[in-house]
Amino acid sequence: MLQVPELPDTDPEETAEWRDAFLALVATQGPERARHLLQELARLARSQRVGWQPGLNTPYVNTVGVQEQGVFPGDLAIEERLGSIIRWNALAMVVRANQAYGELGGHIASYASAADLFESGFNHFFRAREGLGAGQHRGDLVFFQPHSAPGVYARAFLEGRLSEQDLMHYRQELTAPTVGAHGLSSYPHPWLMPDFWQFPTGSMGIGPISSIYHARFMRYLTHRNLLDCAGRKVWGVFGDGEMDEPESTSALTLASREGLDNLVWVVNCNLQRLDGPVRGNGRIIDELERLFAGAGWNVIKLVWGSDWDGLFARDLTGALARALEGTVDGQMQTFAAKDGRFNRDNFFGQNPELAALAQGMTDEQIDRLKRGGHDLVKIHAAYAAASAHKGQPTVILAHTKKGYGMGTSGQGKMTTHSQKKLDGADLIEFRNRFNLPLTDEQATGLAFYKPAEDSAEMQYLRRHRQPLGGYLPRRETACEALPVPPITSYAQFALQADGKEMSTTMAFVRMLTGLLKDAMLGPRIVPIVADEARTFGMANLFKQIGIYSSVGQRYAPEDIGSVLAYREALDGQILEEGISEAGAIASWTAAATSYSVHGLAMLPFYIYYSMFGFQRVGDAIWAAADQRARGFLLGATSGRTTLGGEGLQHQDGTSHLVAATIPNCKAYDPAYAGEMAVIVDAGMREMVTEQRDVFYYVTLMNENYAQPDLPEGAAEGVLRGCYIFDSWRRLSDKRERPISSKNVTLLGSGAILTEVVKAAELLTAEGLEVTVLSVTSWSELARDGQACEQRALAGEAAPGVPWVTQQLAETRGPVIAATDYVRAVPESVRAFIPPGRRYLTLGTDGFGRSDTRAALREFFGVDAQSVAKAARFALQNGGA
């Protein structure tokens, strides 16, 4: 049992007088006056340095009292029957799949604990999109606990959106189409079910942080007068164990700071994670109450069901409240796993007062005492209170039993999370527990059950969803396409750079500044930074377009007279996320999926230190890809040697390797501003005009060097991954290419292309004929080559020739490839080098160092001398 320390009472008589006076105050002047006096006393205690502060925990009872819960607006009996049917179909779906194929997996216990939390939302609160017209509700955003996906499928089956064949192919996405069915993904995956799921939540922690930044982005849209999101909510149903993920709780203070009363979390506190109790020796609800209250959230505890109301009313001595306060979660889990007789003896049998409360109750009645998260009346009261609350985000801490209703096979068991098979007796017990109209044969045969279309249950289900906008989850894609301005309107300086020195980061910021001025596209651009705008030369945008702030700017900034003044504004356009890459990528995802979530296309540009992208928040980027995000990720200060002095933790040599693993990510490493202009133009057209489900990753460098004009006809090669770059066109003396019998081909990308060009000049001076290719995307070249291979393997008559093979066919000699990334990046195209050509790769494998660029490039062997040395080696050792 939990020991709660208390200060000794040195004067009980005086204490009683204070207590009586306070009770009289509440009775005569009401709770508002009582709260005011308590606040005054707390202020006085602080001023007198008493050393006391109010505790963040409230009694272990429901926040919404019986007198405040209102009248339940639904038909409780029908809703309970519907819930029981959905529970059964969810269970049958998982057990069927695992009886047929034991390796498929799935979860029964999570949805069993959350079913009523879901159903109350579906029947009364979760609003679907009515349409995109004026006055039409654009829908709530609902993040579903991933392990409860079977329950969502089971409800969609009753709604007629999924067939019995679909349910029979749970987790069989490849097999299902062969029999005309839709395979159901394991968890919410928009990529796999693009008309169904909106938000991927399968990776713990990603859903919670995403929900916060989606709620904030809705305020951003409203405050910038782009879309009125009033009346829309973001609901998130998450697990208590999931709250241990850093991403789950890292943005709690942002939600309260922004006053996001459009955000409601429901934390399913079933007290169990995969291996055992979440807090066996403590109480997770108390811990989460302190956490959320301290972070400034409105906390609603949903602990006990209606069956407990009479017990609390009769608890005149406080024995029940004290016993519950002293029971740790590990013991509470044991009570959930045991029957009524055990609970009578071990809980109510602790003392005579508790025993008296249970007198007259049967063991079955004790066994059926519901926790708050299983009582539809209490859930509705909590949801209604959360929906009405203003000024703060709300969290509902719902007490449930994991595996609720699974009886001795699963309820409260340590192993219940992985339970996916039940025997005949267990199935019949489940049927009986929920009064399902199934024969023994149907129950043991795992027959799906769907009431007749004209039944009271089906009519009720439809009648309650209709005023809420229809069924959900439902992912929409209807969105107006955006025109993209001509490339010359914002990037002419890059296309015709004429040898001017600048970094590609500087060039990008100049392009972005031009794009922001476009009347059509400009307002839809969302610049996002994680406290690095000044590093990237973007400070001029502070004054030009402002930094978004939900309260405007309540102070005069120190630099108010400067052209670079730090200007915050209610309608500011920049999302300045502070030192939070997790928050910044969540904001980027919210903007990059706005076309689907809100029916409004937005174009986010998130610029960051490239090392702190895929390496730091790769899981969030993967989830964004699953969600079919559209936008730009700009990995600035990229390259292991280009960043120079920052050293091991900051120098990126791997981001392009990771980016290549994401199927809908197009990754580019342009060396020159003209190349980048072509890439940005193509990306915008592909994402907001053609509306394709891709996003772009472009690396930018902070090294200043001469920028050549983009060669005529190079655009196709830039986009496909490489083109022949003739370095002689940049030479001031207009020399002709020398004629030689010795040939070598050099490939380079990013800032290392400048070293490759220098190497070409060194080799040319030695009498070699050198061709230089600028590689803008190793991953696009590799994918193109792999696609040709796949077509050939499939027996297609014209599988095509890989682009890199075509380009190299116009060159001769061994091929040397150099990058500022690990060698695995250029190695990805080895299979597509023309037969008989020697291929050597140079890269920056290993940890970074702090030094000058020249020293770093020499150390890693990617400077001009090293590239030239590799070329000589290849020629001397039989290179073709």
Language model regions located:
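N-terminal amphipathic, basic-rich helices that act as targeting or association modules
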Residues: L2-E159, S163, F430, M502-D518, ...
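Glycine- and acidic
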Residues: V4, A21-A24, V71-E79, A97-G106, ...
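Cofactor-binding active-site loop characterized by glycine-rich and histidine/acidic residues
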Residues: G74-I86, A90-A100, H107-E258, N281-G282, ...
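Glycine-rich phosphate/pyrophosphate-binding loops
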Residues: E130, M218-D228, T593-G613, F632, ...
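Thiamine diphosphate
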Residues: A176-P200, I206, Y220-G231, T249-G445, ...
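A structural-propensity feature for long, helix-poor, extended segments
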Residues: G236-G239, M243, D619-R640, G645
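Residue-level marker for buried hydrophobic side chains located in beta-strands
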Residues: G236-V237, W265, I528, L634, ...
